[in-house]
Amino acid sequence: AQVIGKSWTTTVGTSLLNKVYGVGFIPVFDVQLAFPYEKKISSYKADARFFVTQKLDGFRAIVEFDNGKVVSIKTRKGKVIDGLTELIEDIERAISADFGHIILDGELLLEDKENKWTSGERFQKTGQMISTDGECEGMGFHIFDALPYDEFQAGVSKLTYTERRQQYLEQFNK
């Protein structure tokens, strides 16, 4: 006898499937987001080391860089951002091909050389520039973190943030 004769849909998400079948069963594109430190400060050890960076109000982006060339620039949701030729050229000039295949995690922010926009205006102008067709001129990329491509895909780094910061980010500021 047939008990169920209908197709049933499910609301099972990728996080549950990855929990059941193992991390990476379904690849998830994700980046770490900032959070208010007040809620977590009590969980840190007294001698814990952490970094504080300025809030920029730009657009989070991931740059895939491989042997001297930018492969892609994506939003934090994984959507490719086009029209950043000038920025791509700047990144390729600034970063050595010796770094191999890496991911740069940072924030896109339209340059405000005259310092005339409020934070909100700058955010709005950056968003407008990114979302329109054509080339985006005057776009900057502020790097928060950098790690090897394979480690980004695995979601685990062999180095601490402090070590990555020393290895990569200091090199970029030269």
Language model: regions and residue ranges:
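Charged, flexible boundary elements
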Residues: 23-54
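Structured, non-catalytic alpha/beta "coupling" segments that mediate domain-domain communication
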Residues: 2-24
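Covalent nucleotidyltransferase
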Residues: 45-173
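Short, charged/polar low-complexity linear motifs in solvent-exposed/disordered segments
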Residues: 16-19, 27, 89-92
